[in-house]
UniProtKB/Swiss-Prot annotation:
CDD domains: trmE, TrmE_N. It holds the Pfam family MnmE_helical. Keywords: Cytoplasm, GTP-binding, Hydrolase, Magnesium, Metal-binding, Nucleotide-binding, Potassium, tRNA processing. One of its GO terms (cellular component) is cytoplasm. Its cofactor is K(+). The gene is mnmE. GO terms for molecular function: GTP binding; GTPase activity; metal ion binding. InterPro entries: G_TrmE, GTP-bd, GTP-bd_TrmE_N, GTPase_MnmE, MnmE_dom2, MnmE_helical, P-loop_NTPase, Small_GTP-bd. It comes from Ruegeria sp. (strain TM1040). Its EC number is 3.6.-.-. Homodimer. Heterotetramer of two MnmE and two MnmG subunits. It is an enzyme of class 3 (hydrolase). This is tRNA modification GTPase MnmE. Residues 213-351 form the TrmE-type G domain.
Amino acid sequence: METIFALATAQGKAGVAVIRVSGPHAIEIGEKLTRRTLPARGMIFSKLKDSAGEILDEALVLSFTSPDSFTGENIVEFQLHGSIAVVSAVMSAIEETGVARLADPGEFTRRALDNGKLDLTQVEGLADLIDAETEAQRKQAQVILAGTLGDLADRWRTDLIRAASLIEVTIDFADEEVPVDVTPEVKQLLSGVLHDIEKEVDGVAIAERIREGFEVAIVGSPNVGKSTLLNALAGRTAAITSEYAGTTRDVIEVRMDLAGLPVTLLDTAGLRETDDHVEGIGIRLAQERAERADIRVFLAEEDESFSIQMREGDLRLLPKADERRSAKGAISGRTGQGVDDLVSRISDTLRNRTAHDGIATRARHRETMNRAVLSLRQAIEVVEQGPEFYDLAAEDMRSAIRALELLVGRINVENLLDEIFSSFCLGK
């Protein structure tokens, strides 16, 4: 196994930079640069020198010996001043030792996976934690990174192996009298795992929205204040506003943190009949995005109707509260009237929905768990038909077990790993 190194912090000028080295020669490299013996697991403060003895910097040097490290290999980390010149000099000194190469993106984490320090779901959790923009995303990623989904999958797998072993024993003694009917215990094990997995599958859709973000579309006729409201919600000028109808012709997106949840606000083209080809394209796009949005905020008069039908959770408000005698049920992006109340209502709706999220967060999780669900349903049906069909039930159970192994990355995930690790930085 080669020794690898990389800058683990962001490139550019900073107060502190961290360079990570992992592999069989990591300790050797640390001792060459410090001219000192490193502890098996500890930290020293030392000058760093190149091969000619020139002082490059003073640094905290952390050392971890295999297997008690992030990658499961020997690791040395140099915490030094974040000068671009200092980082470049230390990186060059490491390369000049001739026993290490620059890491590929995500290679440290790949080694942690290969060495059993993380499972695939934890790798995905780490990627999500790095990308987290809101508190809800951070909490969600931490749960996955802690191994919660992997632990669940291992528990399900253990129960299925137990059920399969009972079936296999019965098959092996098919010509003899088996003293105990294993059918009740097998059905109980299979039904329990099936119930748990189905519950997780039901929560994936909401969990995915937390990870990827919710969409809230502002919908209405032209010139009712949609863009002004978007700007008020965003706290900045994100959309052009004017007194002329049809100013907005494209969907304008603003990403924001709404009570800890990731939300993308959509300002859409005004809905109306038009002979303008470009405006017509914008209106069709507005309708498509509004149909897919999690919540639609309709700015409309009481007697107005649209081709887009309201759904549960959608909100309908009267526009331009500042121009009305009675502002009840109305909102104004220009004055801010009703904006705080709208934010609260959107937040409450989304929080109520996220109360039913699951641990699994990705389409991949849902797909592999659905494979297991299908196999388990078939296994239960076959078991109920009697011992003469146990060999078919055993194959269904093995299929369910393989699906769970795929979930945590034990089998057939090379292409997926390449995709995941390509999004990591060099030092991760």
